[in-house]
């Protein structure tokens, strides 16, 4: 079986300040293979639970080039302005960009779960279930695309 590779969407952007929590920012560094696995596993675990189930949901995997692009966006950390498409096109593929902001450090799983929880306000084939709710983080994470 051929393992399909889905480039990690630029969904891994945490803009945080140091808080009073016991979680240290060093514990969240994406250079740590354990953190990379946490991010990928959380995405893949949640993507398997979408309803209705996807017929061709690709498995996400870590990509260092895309991670570096996400890092550059996080260093800019402007929640009001996403990176221009030209700045997040990698290998001819336009990557999405989700932000998670917190006043204190949170785990990657917490941030990814918060994006996924937008599913409560989204109905497949219809869209947002009411005006003014945020669903774009969820729909971007769960959207399937052809092989790269």
UniProtKB/Swiss-Prot annotation:
Major location category of this protein: secreted
Spell out the post-translational modification annotation for this entry. Answer: Contains 8 disulfide bonds.
Tell me one Pfam family matched here. Answer: CAP
Where in the body, by tissue, does this protein show up? Expressed by the venom gland.
Keywords from the UniProt entry:
Calcium channel impairing toxin, Disulfide bond, Ion channel impairing toxin, Neurotoxin, Potassium channel impairing toxin, Secreted, Signal, Toxin
Q: Which InterPro entries does UniProt cross-reference here?
A: CAP_dom, CAP_sf, CRISP-related
Location of the SCP domain? 41-140
Q: Where is the signal peptide?
A: 1-22
Cellular location of this protein? Secreted
Q: Which SMART domains match?
A: SCP
Family named by the database record: Belongs to the CRISP family.
Query: What is the protein name given in its UniProt record?
Result: Cysteine-rich venom protein VAR6
Recite the lineage of the species.
Eukaryota, Metazoa, Chordata, Craniata, Vertebrata
């Amino acid at each position: 079986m051929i393992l399909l590779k889905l480039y990690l969407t630029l969904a891994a952007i945490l803009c945080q300040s140091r808080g009073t929590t016991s979680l240290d920012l060093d514990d969240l560094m994406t250079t740590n293979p354990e953190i990379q696995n946490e991010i990928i596993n959380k995405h893949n675990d949640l993507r398997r639970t979408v309803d209705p189930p996807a017929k061709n949901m690709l498995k996400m995997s870590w990509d260092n080039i895309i991670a570096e692009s996400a890092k550059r966006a996080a260093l800019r950390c402007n929640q009001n302005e996403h990176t221009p498409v030209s700045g997040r096109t990698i290998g001819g593929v336009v990557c999405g960009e989700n932000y998670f902001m917190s006043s204190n450090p949170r785990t990657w799983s917490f941030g990814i779960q918060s994006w996924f929880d937008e599913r409560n306000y989204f109905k497949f084939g219809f869209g947002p279930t009411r005006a003014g709710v945020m669903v774009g983080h969820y729909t971007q994470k769960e959207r399937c695309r052809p092989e790269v």
